[in-house]
């Protein structure tokens, strides 16, 4: 990517975040174009893409035959097909899997590194962007396109915007916002996604979890009414037979080191500690707090105490901004 990522700063929680412009270099864009795009994606992802309008974006999962996610995709309509945003570490293997059946369809599936991904969040983010675009997305219209730019709106953990654009517009936005906005890299957007309870699937956890283990059903990412797609039988079984015993949790506290994706944590059981869960993502905030996104049993007691393995510090469950009740 020719557009240079901004230097890192320690991320801040949404409630205290000043106006911030972020380069999303740890995320990557991919596209599907061609006459069969919608039909092809409908047979590959958990969401009902045939019902998607130009004004919507959604989080869908792309699964293997056993219902385990290669990746989750932030999906929106783009040109005569679709585009999606996923973690850069999983894009290449995810596209390889997606292309396996494409030989029989009129589609072109490709990575897109020409466009730039930026995030805008923090204090008065909407007001800052209102000076630069004629229309901004909102709850009613979550995707807005203007020229070479697509803007995606997010409600949680606080209003924020993801911008997909060309290099010239990215440079213009940076020049216009540089004076009033802090600049940061992907870690700040990652911190906001963790706070929002959006599952982060990096390479270490690709092919490990069914979508419901990461709360995708609570985020509107699974249609149980659409036709066949890869992995559907297992995803449906998890819902209708209660086969899923896991959920995505948000933990906050302190830790002397940050656990890596794929690592387990320890749960306090009386005087002892027992290994539990799988870490998806972690960040350390500027106030020293550590936030951890982890998949664990879905029946954890709300007052449970956790720690990074053999650590002296502890982590506790924080509420997510959505309900898991079905």
From Swiss-Prot:
<feature type="binding site">
    <location>
        <position position="27"/>
    </location>
    <ligand>
        <name>folate</name>
    </ligand>
</feature>
<dbReference type="GO" id="GO:0008033">
    <property type="term" value="P:tRNA processing"/>
</dbReference>
<dbReference type="InterPro" id="IPR006222">
    <property type="entry name" value="GCV_T_N"/>
</dbReference>
<dbReference type="InterPro" id="IPR045179">
    <property type="entry name" value="YgfZ/GcvT"/>
</dbReference>
<dbReference type="InterPro" id="IPR029043">
    <property type="entry name" value="GcvT/YgfZ_C"/>
</dbReference>
<keyword id="KW-0963">Cytoplasm</keyword>
<comment type="function">
    <text>Folate-binding protein involved in regulating the level of ATP-DnaA and in the modification of some tRNAs. It is probably a key factor in regulatory networks that act via tRNA modification, such as initiation of chromosomal replication.</text>
</comment>
<dbReference type="GO" id="GO:0005542">
    <property type="term" value="F:folic acid binding"/>
</dbReference>
<feature type="binding site">
    <location>
        <position position="189"/>
    </location>
    <ligand>
        <name>folate</name>
    </ligand>
</feature>
<protein>
    <recommendedName>
        <fullName>tRNA-modifying protein YgfZ</fullName>
    </recommendedName>
</protein>
<dbReference type="InterPro" id="IPR023758">
    <property type="entry name" value="tRNA-modifying_YgfZ"/>
</dbReference>
<dbReference type="GO" id="GO:0016226">
    <property type="term" value="P:iron-sulfur cluster assembly"/>
</dbReference>
<dbReference type="GO" id="GO:0009451">
    <property type="term" value="P:RNA modification"/>
</dbReference>
<keyword id="KW-0819">tRNA processing</keyword>
<dbReference type="GO" id="GO:0005737">
    <property type="term" value="C:cytoplasm"/>
</dbReference>
<dbReference type="InterPro" id="IPR017703">
    <property type="entry name" value="YgfZ/GcvT_CS"/>
</dbReference>
<comment type="similarity">
    <text>Belongs to the tRNA-modifying YgfZ family.</text>
</comment>
<dbReference type="InterPro" id="IPR048451">
    <property type="entry name" value="YgfZ_barrel"/>
</dbReference>
<dbReference type="Pfam" id="PF21130">
    <property type="entry name" value="YgfZ_barrel"/>
</dbReference>
<keyword id="KW-0290">Folate-binding</keyword>
<dbReference type="Pfam" id="PF01571">
    <property type="entry name" value="GCV_T"/>
</dbReference>
